[in-house]
């Protein structure tokens, strides 16, 4: 995961201001979603994930947000 550890990526789900949206471009075989929010270390992180069962999530990838993604996130909140 590009500069973001698995443990750090999983903390984004605790961000009450995080934004979740569908990832239609990568959802051919499974319903992938993307969350953008702050990790507990304060980084703005983008995580691609799939909900497997209730309360079970599989992380696919995670990375720090680009400057454009950061601006988009700030305007969506």
Residues covered by each model-derived region:
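Ribonuclease/tRNase effector modules and their secretory precursors
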Residues: 1-77
């Amino acid at each position: 995961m590009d500069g973001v550890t698995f443990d750090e990526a999983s903390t984004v789900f605790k961000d009450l201001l995080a934004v979740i949206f569908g990832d239609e471009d990568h959802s051919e075989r499974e319903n992938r979603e993307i969350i953008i929010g702050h990790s507990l270390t304060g980084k703005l992180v983008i995580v691609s994930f799939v909900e497997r069962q209730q309360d079970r999530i599989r992380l696919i990838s995670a990375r720090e947000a680009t400057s454009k993604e950061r601006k988009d996130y700030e305007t969506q909140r």
